[in-house]
């Protein structure tokens, strides 16, 4: 995907046209992410006094900005004003979390109507008529809505919003720079907010008035303009950490001075009443009490979004350390926010072998450290959520989430103690157990109809998997010589695996599967692929006489290459069947893996009654590869999207297992018959 066009012609990643940027605010020196984004954008942070050709950088209208303005004026240096982008992080900057993008403005600052700005220039003069750009804008707007993403994201969509039908009045931080810029008269800001509240009541007789307090006011960091004195029978202060998207959905009207929530209200379909002069006022999408002069153009929501979110910001990809388009920032933020929402209460974990604990701590313990305990009472009383390794769960673990490896796991085997890139956490059951409904079952049902954006995303992901032969373990191997004819691939499995115990029928061993295939396809070329754990001598399932039933035993073979070389696949419950479906190879299931029973496979067993919809292969893939698993990038040490995980698997630039894990793995080969000790 190409990077979004920038309004700054000298902003480059390569640094071919660079500029010295003199700063007089310590934050430019201490905030590594800010420095890095500016560096990638072509700016060398410098100290001292500027010379000809140099520029001066200031942080918006911060308390230290006057220093830079004075130096710039004295030395005739251009000012570059820098701010956080409109999609920033989970927490505000005061928590130390780095931004995912910056607004680098060489003209003014977006919230000050007394100055021009690069954003206002875009809104005034850019054609904003490119069909591809508008399509990107609409897709990104939908993604932000679906994922409940905002500038700051320390809220949970499960927090219930108020009863709908209210008029939303947005409070802001007292003396906020955007308020000062919109109301430049000293002392007039409080009166403006009072006026806004009065208008909201007068223009909506009988309606409930909901004052949304600013998160930093709710947390006691900074005062707002409204407090308990403004509440009455009709007016309520609301400070619950609810999704802004849900809050706007229930509103019948929105009133704000200059809050970003006003911008989000426009994107949600509102025409908010504006009592300041923010960048989004004056373009025909708002009702302006004080219309900004010179804004005569009429824009659509998609045009405004394209300018403010795609063209104006400088976005950063923390996984690849590069500038990037908005879409990749949404990918990254969505993964980080999902981790915060699921992990913020902390986790107690049971039945986790020692070697798994460090990777799990990195995966799930970034917001609150995990605790590991085999005492169920301790786990229940911990005040944390509870997880158990799925195959080890018993009735004593009722109520715990079930944990398992995801479907794009690693370069190397789990049995060789290679840490996973992907894990699934299921509240109901687990994907390989067809005896009870799982979260994956629900997700597949929800994804029967994909939006065009979702379909494009998953199709692109699947095409990359196919092109680069990405599978669960990504083991290298050669393709053996295969006889001509109708080829049937039979993947072997670990015979004591939970998926066999729970998901197989009468055909529940590799030998029985081979015999069934030979009986059904007597003239076919039958290719048997042993499971890599079995090949490594780490798990049960070896067939001594496989050649009696198979024409080829493809040991150490590349599974993706095998799939591409056959006409069909027969399996009990192997994930290789799912990988074959992605490659449009027909699959016969004699068991009930998660992908059976939806009309995509030829099934020998009756499917569970809840598998009663007919998704397409892309719907199945979206649920299984995007919605269900979580991914973790060991290079950036951050939650990540499936696309980043695939990047890592393709490049192979993954940390190798530590020496202790390698030693344990070798020991396991000697103790394979005692696998319960280490699995």
Task: Label the predicted regions.
Residues 62-68, 241-286, 387-400, 404, ...:
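A donor-sugar binding/catalytic signature common to diverse glycosyltransferases
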Residues 47-53, 57-70, 74-90, 147, ...:
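Segments forming glycine/polar-rich beta-alpha architectures that bind adenosine-containing cofactors
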Residues 197-240, 514-556:
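Catalytic donor nucleotide-activated moiety binding site of glycosyltransferases and closely related
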Residues 83-85, 164-178, 213-214, 277, ...:
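Short loop/turn segments at strand-loop or loop-helix junctions that form parts
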Residues 35-38, 169, 182-203, 361, ...:
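Histidine-anchored nucleotide/phosphate-binding helix
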Residues 1-69, 175-176, 326-384, 390-397, ...:
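N-terminal pre-catalytic "stem/leader" segment of glycosyltransferase-like enzymes
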Residues 49, 246-247, 379, 481, ...:
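Structural alpha-helical scaffold elements that stabilize or flank donor/cofactor-binding regions
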């Amino acid at each position: 995907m190409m990077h979004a066009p920038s309004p700054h012609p000298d902003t480059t990643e390569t640094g071919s046209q660079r500029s010295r940027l003199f700063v007089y605010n310590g934050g430019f020196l201490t905030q590594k992410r800010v420095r890095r984004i500016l560096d990638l954008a072509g700016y060398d942070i410098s100290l001292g006094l500027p010379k000809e050709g140099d520029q001066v950088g200031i942080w918006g209208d911060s308390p230290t900005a006057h220093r830079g303005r004075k130096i710039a004026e004295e030395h005739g240096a251009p000012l570059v004003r820098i701010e956080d982008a409109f999609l920033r992080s989970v927490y505000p900057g005061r928590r130390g979390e780095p931004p995912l993008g910056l607004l680098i403005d060489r003209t003014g600052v977006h919230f000050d109507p007394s100055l021009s700005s690069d954003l206002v220039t875009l809104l005034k003069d850019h054609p904003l008529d490119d069909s591809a750009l508008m399509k990107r804008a609409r897709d990104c707007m939908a993604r932000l809505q679906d994922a409940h993403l905002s500038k700051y994201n320390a809220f949970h969509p499960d927090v219930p919003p108020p009863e709908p039908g209210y008029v939303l009045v947005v409070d802001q931080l007292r003396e906020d720079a955007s308020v000062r810029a919109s109301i430049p008269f000293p002392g007039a800001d409080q009166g403006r907010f009072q006026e806004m509240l009065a208008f909201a009541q007068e223009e909506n007789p009988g309606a409930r008035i909901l004052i949304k307090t600013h998160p930093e006011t709710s947390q006691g960091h900074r005062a707002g303009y409204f407090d308990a004195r403004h509440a009455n029978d009709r007016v309520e202060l609301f400070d619950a950490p609810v999704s802004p998207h849900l809050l706007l959905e229930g509103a019948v009207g929105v009133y704000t001075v200059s809050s970003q929530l006003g911008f989000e209200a426009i994107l949600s379909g509102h025409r908010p009443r504006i009592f300041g002069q923010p960048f989004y006022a004056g373009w025909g999408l708002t009702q302006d009490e004080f219309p900004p002069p010179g804004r005569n153009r009429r824009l659509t929501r998609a045009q405004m979004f394209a300018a403010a979110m795609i063209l104006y910001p400088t976005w950063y990809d923390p996984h690849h350390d590069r500038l990037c388009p908005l879409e990749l920032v949404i990918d990254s933020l969505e993964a980080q926010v999902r981790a915060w929402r699921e992990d913020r209460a902390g986790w107690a974990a049971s039945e986790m072998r020692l070697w798994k604990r460090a990777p799990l701590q990195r995966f799930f313990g970034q917001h609150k450290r995990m605790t590991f305990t085999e005492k169920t009472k301790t786990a229940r009383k911990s005040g944390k959520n509870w997880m158990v390794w799925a195959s080890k769960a018993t009735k004593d673990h009722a109520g715990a989430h079930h944990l398992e490896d995801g479907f794009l796991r690693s370069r190397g085997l789990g049995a060789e103690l290679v840490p996973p890139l992907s894990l699934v956490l299921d509240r109901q059951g687990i994907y390989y157990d067809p005896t009870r409904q799982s979260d994956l079952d629900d997700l597949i049902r929800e994804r029967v109809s994909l939006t065009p954006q979702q379909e494009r995303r998953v199709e692109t992901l699947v095409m990359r998997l196919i092109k680069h032969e990405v599978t669960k373990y990504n083991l290298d191997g050669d393709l053996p010589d295969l006889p001509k004819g109708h080829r049937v691939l039979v993947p072997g499995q670990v015979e004591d695996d939970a998926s066999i115990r729970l998901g197989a029928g009468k055909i529940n061993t590799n030998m029985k599967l081979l015999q069934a295939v030979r009986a059904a396809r007597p003239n076919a070329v039958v290719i048997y692929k042993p499971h890599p754990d079995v090949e490594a001598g780490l798990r049960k399932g070896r067939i001594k006489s496989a050649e009696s039933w198979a024409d080829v035993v493809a040991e150490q073979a590349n599974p993706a290459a095998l799939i591409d070389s056959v006409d069909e696949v027969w399996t009990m419950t192997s994930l290789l069947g799912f990988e074959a479906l992605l490659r449009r190879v027909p699959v016969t299931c004699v068991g009930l893996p998660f992908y059976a029973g939806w009309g995509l496979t030829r099934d020998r067993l009756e499917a569970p009654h809840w598998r009663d919809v007919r998704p397409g292969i892309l719907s199945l893939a979206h649920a299984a590869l995007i919605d269900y698993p979580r991914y973790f990038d060991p290079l950036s040490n951050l939650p990540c999207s499936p696309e980043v995980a695939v990047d890592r698997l393709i490049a192979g630039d993954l940390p190798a297992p530590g020496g202790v894990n390698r030693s344990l793995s070798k020991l396991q080969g000697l103790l394979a018959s005692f696998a319960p000790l280490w699995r």
